[in-house]
């Protein structure tokens, strides 16, 4: 299962700004997705590892985490993000 990280379009940024906000301090934790999550990082820097694959994301990135993904989040700088579960 691949994690997608890219720069969002202006339309995606506008749409995500109406979604809830989640924050997290510097930490490391395991997470499993029972539904797909799309998030727009407003602040912070993270690396998410799924087995041998690692993906980094920073403020301004749009990330999509697929349903069924089990991973480890390493929050290197405090995170603030808008999120949407589908």
Language-model-derived ranges and their functions:
Residues 1-8, 12-13, 54, 59:
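Cytosolic regulatory regions built on CNB/CRP/Popeye-like sensor folds
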Residues 6, 16-34, 66-68:
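Conserved short histidine dyad/triad with adjacent acidic residue
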Residues 33-48:
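Short, conserved beta-strand element in jelly-roll/cupin
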Residues 25, 49-53, 76:
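Short strand-coil-strand connectors
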Residues 31, 48, 81-84:
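Short hydrophobic/aromatic-rich beta-strand segments that constitute the beta-sheet cores
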Residues 67-86:
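Ligand-binding loop in jelly-roll beta-barrel domains
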Residues 51-67:
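Short acidic-glycine-tyrosine-enriched beta hairpin
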């Amino acid at each position: 299962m691949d994690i997608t990280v890219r720069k969002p379009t202006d339309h995606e940024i506008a749409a995500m700004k109406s979604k809830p906000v989640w924050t997290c301090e510097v930490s490391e934790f395991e997470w499993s997705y029972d539904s797909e999550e799309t998030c727009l990082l407003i602040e912070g820097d993270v690396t998410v590892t799924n087995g041998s694959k690692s993906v980094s994301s920073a403020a301004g990135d749009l990330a999509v985490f697929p349903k069924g993904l089990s991973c480890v989040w390493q929050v290197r700088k405090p995170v603030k993000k808008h999120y949407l579960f589908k």
